[in-house]
Amino acid sequence: MASNNDSIKKTLFVVIALSLVCSIIVSAAAVGLRDKQKENAALDKQSKILQVAGIEAKGSKQIVELFNKSIEPRLVDFNTGDFVEGDAANYDQRKAAKEASESIKLTAEQDKAKIQRRANVGVVYLVKDGDKTSKVILPVHGNGLWSMMYAFVAVETDGNTVSGLTYYEQGETPGLGGEVENPAWRAQWVGKKLFDENHKPAIKIVKGGAPQGSEHGVDGLSGATLTSNGVQNTFDFWLGDMGFGPFLTKVRDGGLN
């Protein structure tokens, strides 16, 4: 009888030990996978920023090298448009927007982009050419038909002229609203003026196509009116006083160099 009890105890010990070992292995693998996913996400973000800046990079090593050499993240106070101190490289604006102490809840009138909350501080990316800043990259986002759409827009140091646009995260309908990622559509933005002569937001997404030579007009997305409206609303918000408007005013007045 004692022999049977010993056998059962040994079996239970082996089962428990194996379970513990397996759980440790699974936990370690999950942590490793999560870290790898974060690393890949950061690398993809750097790649998109370089792309919109017009800097070609091939392979992860070159992406990191060129990003560190050519891009300077800075924090901006949305209320004043001033640079503020802080760890811009690791700042999570999405997370900050969810924290009541680090953000504001937008009123229905303010919330043109339908983002609900806006962080108090935003991150911008300065494209460096030696000691000089050649462009500034703004992260913008707004609601489309099916998804929140995230983009980077590169602006010349006049604070007005677009030099590039890339949508890097969106869930719109492929072939319709998803065409925000189409290189041909994005190319239309280059050279467009964000503001009119009175420094008011002026970019317009035009259903049926923008007039030839329009300074402010971009063709609407065919068959995707609501996504096009989402793009319009995104820029209306982020170019305004609640977004990067105060910062771009300072850029226009020579605040970068």
UniProtKB/Swiss-Prot annotation:
Pfam families per UniProt: FMN_bind
Give the function comment from the record: NQR complex catalyzes the reduction of ubiquinone-1 to ubiquinol by two successive reactions, coupled with the transport of Na(+) ions from the cytoplasm to the periplasm. NqrA to NqrE are probably involved in the second step, the conversion of ubisemiquinone to ubiquinol.
GO term, biological process aspect, one: sodium ion transport
What's the superkingdom here? Bacteria
Q: Name one GO molecular function term.
A: oxidoreductase activity, acting on NAD(P)H, quinone or similar compound as acceptor
Per the record, residues carrying FMN phosphoryl threonine are T225
This protein's assembly is summarised as: Composed of six subunits; NqrA, NqrB, NqrC, NqrD, NqrE and NqrF.
The reactions it catalyses are:
a ubiquinone + n Na(+)(in) + NADH + H(+) = a ubiquinol + n Na(+)(out) + NAD(+)
Top enzyme category: translocase
Kindly give the InterPro entries that the UniProt entry links to this protein: FMN-bd (IPR007329), NqrC (IPR010204)
Which UniProt keywords are given for this protein, alphabetically ordered?
A: Cell inner membrane, Cell membrane, Flavoprotein, FMN, Ion transport, Membrane, NAD, Phosphoprotein, Sodium, Sodium transport, Translocase, Transmembrane, Transmembrane helix, Transport, Ubiquinone
What compartments host this protein?
Cell inner membrane
Which EC number(s) does the record attach to this protein? Answer: 7.2.1.1
What's its membrane topology? Single-pass membrane protein
Instruction: Family membership, please give it.
Output: Belongs to the NqrC family.
Transmembrane annotation, as ranges: 12-32
Q: Which GO terms describe its cellular component?
A: plasma membrane
What is the official name of this protein in its record? Answer: Na(+)-translocating NADH-quinone reductase subunit C
Q: Which cofactor does it need?
A: FMN
